[in-house]
């Protein structure tokens, strides 16, 4: 049976389900394979986190520990981590909104089909 032979509401729901699956796959792919990179304000420390917000990379400018000391560098690492987490959270929020919109559209299409 082709999409042309289906009830229009069923066909729409299937199309929306495929769109939702695609959006979900994209979100999961970003979480598993993506990365978010950020620096401190002075750009002396750079961190990389993955989509699960696990630290996967850290770069500290040469000589910074000696110049500023461990406490100041730790503050910069935390600042960079905060910035990377903010970027990851913004991405996750947008992805969540896309998934919610796709589910809502699917629900409306199915409800219209039952009416």
Swiss-Prot record:
Keyword ATP-binding attributed: no
Protein name: ESX-1 secretion-associated protein EspL
Sites bearing N-acetylserine, chain numbering: 2
UniProt superkingdom: Bacteria
Keywords attached to this entry: Acetylation
Annotated organism of origin: Mycobacterium tuberculosis (strain ATCC 25618 / H37Rv)
Role this protein plays: Probably plays a role in host phagosome maturation arrest.
Organism taxonomic ancestry: Bacteria, Bacillati, Actinomycetota, Actinomycetes, Mycobacteriales
Inactivation phenotype: Grows normally in liquid culture, traffics into host (human and mouse) acidified compartments early after phagocytosis, suggesting it no longer arrests phagosome maturation as well as wild-type, impaired growth in mouse macrophages.
Gene Ontology CC: peptidoglycan-based cell wall; plasma membrane
Example of a GO biological process term: symbiont-mediated suppression of host innate immune response
């Amino acid at each position: 049976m082709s999409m042309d032979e289906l009830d229009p509401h069923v066909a729409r729901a299937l199309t929306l389900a495929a769109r939702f699956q695609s959006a979900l796959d994209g979100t999961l792919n970003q979480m598993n394979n993506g990365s978010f990179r950020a620096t401190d304000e002075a750009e002396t420390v750079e961190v990389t986190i993955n989509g699960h917000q696990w630290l996967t990379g850290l770069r500290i400018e040469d000589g910074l520990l000696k110049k500023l000391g461990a406490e100041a560098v730790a503050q910069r690492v935390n600042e960079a981590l905060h910035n990377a987490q903010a970027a990851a959270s913004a991405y996750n929020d947008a992805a969540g909104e896309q998934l919610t919109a796709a589910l809502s559209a699917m629900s409306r299409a199915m409800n219209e089909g039952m009416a």
